[in-house]
């Protein structure tokens, strides 16, 4: 991974450690292998790291661009339409289908800050229970997936301090924005 993703050695080591602990059977049975948030400005390799992780583990990458889920009604595309709405009988949502097809995957939710706040309820189901239930009652197992959220929260503040003489930031520039978002 370090050969393919430049400048993210610490993040790579943390992810690999978490995966090794999970593979050793030392993780909670009801939770995904790992849940990670990659924060930083555009172009630092957040999405690329997720892609390379899936490639190196030889597992499927299920990528969802969260800018497509900005409106409240678009959240139903992930878990399916509620009963009584058009499309309820057709199929489960995109996320449910991906997890049923590829239970061992890297689940990448790209640019999570652009999604509607209702997405957080779906994330809680995955992170707490290791599964998600669609609107039609179908359950998808997420215990063998690696959940990765990417965000640009705090990047604007970090970029302000990069010109001229300023104190170096120690990677915590987005903590306040992240807490406010969730």
Predicted regions and their residues:
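AAA+ P-loop NTPase nucleotide-binding core of proteostasis motors
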Residues: 1-182
């Amino acid at each position: 991974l370090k050969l393919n993703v430049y400048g993210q050695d610490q993040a790579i080591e943390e992810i690999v450690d978490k995966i090794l602990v999970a593979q050793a059977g030392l993780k909670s049975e009801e939770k995904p292998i790992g849940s990670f948030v990659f924060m930083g400005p555009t172009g630092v390799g957040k999405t690329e790291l997720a892609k390379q992780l899936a490639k190196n583990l030889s597992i499927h990458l299920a990528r969802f661009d969260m800018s497509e889920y900005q409106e409240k009604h678009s959240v139903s595309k992930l878990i399916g339409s509620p009963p009584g709405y058009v499309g309820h009988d057709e199929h489960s949502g995109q996320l449910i289908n991906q997890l049923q097809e590829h239970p061992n995957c890297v689940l990448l939710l790209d640019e999570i800050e652009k999604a509607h706040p209702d997405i957080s309820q779906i994330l809680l189901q995955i992170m707490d229970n290791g599964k998600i239930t669609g609107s039609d009652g179908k359950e998808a197992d997420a215990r063998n997936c690696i959940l990765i959220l990417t965000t640009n929260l705090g990047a604007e503040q970090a970029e302000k301090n990069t010109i001229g003489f300023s104190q170096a930031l120690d990677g915590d520039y987005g903590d306040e924005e992240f807490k406010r978002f969730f």
